[in-house]
UniProtKB/Swiss-Prot annotation:
Organism taxonomic ancestry: Bacteria, Bacillati, Bacillota, Tissierellia, Tissierellales
Protein source organism: Finegoldia magna (strain ATCC 29328 / DSM 20472 / WAL 2508)
InterPro entries per the UniProt record, alphabetical: PyrdxlP-dep_Trfase, PyrdxlP-dep_Trfase_major, PyrdxlP-dep_Trfase_small, Ser_HO-MeTrfase, Ser_HO-MeTrfase-like, Ser_HO-MeTrfase_PLP_BS, SHMT-like_dom
Residues that bear N6-(pyridoxal phosphate)lysine: 230
Alphabetical list of NCBIfam families matching this protein: PRK00011.1
Protein name: Serine hydroxymethyltransferase
Role according to the record: Catalyzes the reversible interconversion of serine and glycine with tetrahydrofolate (THF) serving as the one-carbon carrier. This reaction serves as the major source of one-carbon groups required for the biosynthesis of purines, thymidylate, methionine, and other important biomolecules. Also exhibits THF-independent aldolase activity toward beta-hydroxyamino acids, producing glycine and aldehydes, via a retro-aldol mechanism.
Subunit details: Homodimer.
Gene name as annotated: glyA
UniProt cross-references to PANTHER family, sorted A to Z: SERINE HYDROXYMETHYLTRANSFERASE, SERINE HYDROXYMETHYLTRANSFERASE 1
Family: Belongs to the SHMT family.
Catalysed reaction equations from the record: (6R)-5,10-methylene-5,6,7,8-tetrahydrofolate + glycine + H2O = (6S)-5,6,7,8-tetrahydrofolate + L-serine
Primary enzyme class: transferase
Needed cofactors: pyridoxal 5'-phosphate
Biological process annotations from GO: glycine biosynthetic process from serine; tetrahydrofolate interconversion
SUPFAM superfamilies assigned: PLP-dependent transferases
Length: 412
C-alpha cells in the first residue's frame, strides 16, 4: 500500500521519463494531424481526479451502484451543456470514443445484415462507416458512396441513385478526410425518399458546427455522433445526439447494449470542455482555425501543389504528394525529420496501398490552439514546401520550427 503514496516520478521513473519525452515532442513539433488538439489545463486536471475510482453503470438517477450522487450531478451537467451547445433534443455522453458512438447507433437501429449507405474509406470516410476490416463492414451490408473523380466532392446524385437502388435502412454522412462543406439537408431528403434513418458522424467538424462555422446536422439527422477531442478540444471520448423519439432506444443501446461502466473522470472532463465551448472565445478560436487553413491553402496552391477538391472549406487539407514526386508515407517521414507531424492518407483513386498512400492529411486545430495565426500558418506551409521540395537543409528547417514553436508554448 505504500506504493499508493508515491508520485509517478518516484514510483515509476521509466514511465515518467517517457511522459516527459512526449511533452517535449509536443512542445517542439508543429502538430498538423487534423484529428489532434491540445486540451486546457482544466480539462487535463479533471481527467486525473479521483472520479476515476467510481463505478457508475446506468444513467443519472438510475444506477446499478450506490454512491453515485455526485457523479450523477457531473454527468447531468455534461448532458445539459452538450444539448445546449448543439441545440439538441437529447445527448448521451457515455461513449468511450467516436467508434463506440457510431457502433451504438448501429446497434440501436440495425440488425446484422441490414443495408447501410456510407462513405468509402479511401475517399474520405471512416473505418466505422463500413470498411470490410471493421466490425461495421462485417456485421452489416454496407454499400459505399464516394466523391466525383473530377471535383473531389461528394456526388449527391450518385448517393441518391445508390439509395434508390439498395434501399438502405440507414444512411451515414460525415467523414474523416473531407475538406468541403457537407450538405446535410440533401442527405435528409435522400433518406426520406427511401425511408431510411440518417446518422451524421461530425467527429471532425463538431467544433465548427458548434459555432456556426459549418452547417449543423442536428436539425436533419436522427442521430449525430461525435468525438469530444478534435475541434471540440476536450478529452478523448465520444458522444451522441438524437431526436427525442429515439432517446430510449439510443440510451439502451449504449448501456447495457454496447458498454458497461462509463468513465466518469472523462465525462467530467467532457463537461468542462463543453463549458469552454460555450464561451465567446471559442467562436474566435474556430474562426481562426478556418483562417489558418485558408492561409495554408494559398501557399500550397501558389506553389502548384495539388489539393484534393482544390482546397478547403473547413479545418483540413488533403495534399496529393505526387506534386512532390513522392508517396504519402515518404512525405510524412520527410516532414517528421523537420519536426512537422502529419499523417499519410489515401486520396480518391489512390494507386498506393493504405500503408503507403499518395497523400497526407493536415489540419489547423492544434496550431490554432497554440496561438498561431495567418502569418505563422503561412510560415508553417512554407516550411513544408521547403522540406518536401528540398529547398533547404532539413536541419535548418527543423531549427526554424523549434524556434517558432518556442513562441507558442502549450498551456502556459
Amino acid at each position: 500500500m505504500n506504493n499508493c503514496r508515491q508520485n509517478l516520478e518516484n514510483f515509476d521513473p521509466e514511465v515518467f521519463g517517457y511522459l516527459n519525452d512526449e511533452i517535449k515532442r509536443q512542445e517542439e513539433h508543429i502538430e498538423l494531424i487534423a484529428s489532434e488538439n491540445f486540451v486546457s489545463k482544466a480539462v487535463l486536471e479533471t481527467m486525473g481526479t479521483e472520479l476515476t475510482n467510481k463505478y457508475a453503470e446506468g444513467y443519472p438517477g438510475k444506477r446499478y451502484y450506490g454512491g453515485c450522487e455526485h457523479v450523477d450531478k457531473i454527468e447531468q451537467l455534461a448532458i445539459d451543456r452538450l444539448k445546449k451547445l448543439f441545440n439538441a433534443d437529447h445527448a448521451n455522453v457515455q461513449p468511450h470514443c467516436g467508434a463506440n458512438a457510431n457502433i451504438a447507433v448501429y446497434v440501436a437501429v440495425l440488425k446484422p445484415g441490414d443495408t447501410v449507405l456510407g462513405m468509402r474509406l479511401t475517399e474520405g470516410g471512416h473505418l466505422t462507416h463500413g470498411s470490410p476490416v471493421n466490425m461495421s463492414g462485417k456485421f452489416y451490408n454496407f454499400v459505399d458512396y464516394g466523391v466525383d473523380p473530377e471535383t473531389g466532392t461528394i456526388d449527391y446524385e450518385n448517393v441518391r441513385e445508390l439509395a434508390l437502388k439498395h434501399k438502405p435502412k440507414l444512411i451515414v454522412a460525415g467523414a474523416s478526410a473531407y475538406p468541403r462543406i457537407i450538405d446535410f439537408k440533401k442527405f435528409r431528403e435522400i433518406a426520406d425518399e427511401v425511408g431510411a434513418y440518417l446518422m451524421v458522424d461530425m467527429a471532425h467538424i463538431a467544433g465548427l458546427v458548434a459555432t456556426g462555422d459549418h452547417p449543423s446536422p442536428v436539425p436533419y439527422a436522427d442521430f449525430v455522433t461525435t468525438t469530444t477531442h478534435k475541434t471540440l478540444r476536450g478529452p478523448r471520448g465520444g458522444a451522441i445526439l438524437c431526436k427525442e423519439e429515439h432517446k430510449k432506444l439510443l440510451d439502451k443501446s449504449v448501456f447495457p447494449g454496447f458498454q458497461g461502466g462509463p468513465l466518469e473522470h472523462i465525462i467530467a472532463a467532457k463537461a468542462v470542455c463543453f463549458k469552454e465551448d460555450l464561451q465567446p472565445e471559442f467562436k474566435e478560436y474556430t474562426h481562426q482555425i478556418l483562417k489558418n487553413a485558408k492561409a495554408m491553402e494559398k501557399v500550397f496552391l501558389d506553389n502548384d501543389v495539388r489539393l484534393v477538391s482544390g482546397g478547403t472549406d473547413n479545418h483540413l487539407l488533403l495534399i496529393d504528394c505526387r506534386s512532390f514526386g513522392m508517396t504519402g508515407k515518404e512525405a510524412e517521414n520527410v516532414l517528421s525529420e523537420v519536426n512537422i507531424t502529419t499523417n499519410k492518407n489515401t486520396i480518391p483513386n489512390d494507386p498506393e496501398t493504405p500503408f503507403v498512400t499518395s497523400g497526407i492529411r493536415i489540419g489547423t486545430p492544434a496550431i490554432t490552439t497554440r496561438g498561431l495565426k495567418e502569418a505563422e500558418a503561412t510560415k508553417v506551409a512554407e516550411f513544408m514546401i521547403d522540406a518536401l521540395k528540398k529547398r533547404r537543409p532539413a536541419e535548418e528547417i527543423k531549427n526554424d520550427v523549434v524556434e517558432l514553436m518556442k513562441q507558442f508554448p502549450i498551456n502556459r
